[in-house]
UniProtKB/Swiss-Prot annotation:
Residue intervals passing through the bilayer: 5-27
InterPro entries in alphabetical order: Alpha/beta_knot_MTases, RNA_MeTrfase_C_dom, tRNA_m1G_MTases_N
Similarity comment text for this entry: To T.maritima TM1570.
Location of the protein in the cell: Membrane
Record's keyword terms, sorted: Membrane, Transmembrane, Transmembrane helix
N-terminal signal peptide: none
The protein, known as: Uncharacterized protein aq_054
Keyword Flavoprotein: no
Length: 205
């Protein structure tokens, strides 16, 4: 058994929150006028979301990007960091990128999770607005800790996830409230904050 296979084996079986997955949607997304668009991938989307995903021991992190030219860029980066050269250059990045998967659509993500886990995950949307099915962090944390269901937490890009898609989710997580009214955070900020609120060992309840 080679070293890479051993590392993958260890990471898979020590993940505390193996029933939790996250997805970053580059499509569908909205522009400032509410028009449906495809947003562009940035390198920070890969590294700065994979890091908290690993720190809070999430099962997998999916990047949803349907544009082939963008997918080539993403896959090239993934392949490099999973190569022997990438592992030697940055072992930590080699480890976190093992959590990353690339998908064309959100449906593909759901199907992949179903194939691995044998059941459909409950979908949790994230937004700066509230919806009739908005839930609190404490509620979601308690439900996740029961370990009897799988959860897919979906993060938007651009100006957010379109309402038509949000309305199909099982739950919507309450917005991130800071010290005041300003909450225009990057998606990378939002992912880190939300995962910390749900899974940190030293969170303030």
């Amino acid at each position: 058994m080679n070293t890479e296979i051993i590392v993958l084996f260890i990471i898979h079986f020590i993940m505390i929150n193996e029933n939790v997955f996250i997805a970053l949607l580059h499509y569908p997304a909205m522009d400032k006028d509410g028009k449906i668009i495809v947003t562009s991938f940035t390198t920070m989307d890969l590294h700065d979301i994979a890091r908290p995903a690993r720190a809070y021991e999430i099962n997998k992190y999916y990047i949803v990007q349907p544009i082939d030219a963008q997918r080539i860029v993403i896959q090239r980066q993934i392949n490099y960091w999973l190569s022997e050269e990438g592992r030697k250059a940055n072992p930590t990045r080699y480890e976190i990128v093992q959590l990353v998967r690339l998908a064309y659509t959100l449906d593909e993500v759901i199907e992949d999770i179903e194939k691995e886990r044998g059941r459909r995950p409950l979908l949790v949307g994230t937004d700066a607005r509230t919806y009739p099915n908005t839930v609190k962090y404490s509620w979601l944390r308690n439900e996740i800790q029961k370990r009897d269901r799988d959860w897919l937490i979906v993060f938007g890009t651009g100006h957010g996830i379109p309402p038509d898609l949000m309305n199909t989710f099982d739950y919507i997580l309450e917005p991130i409230y800071g010290a005041g009214d300003w909450n225009h955070l990057s998606v990378r900020n939002a992912v880190a904050i939300i995962l910390d609120r749900l899974f940190s060992r030293n969170r303030c309840d």
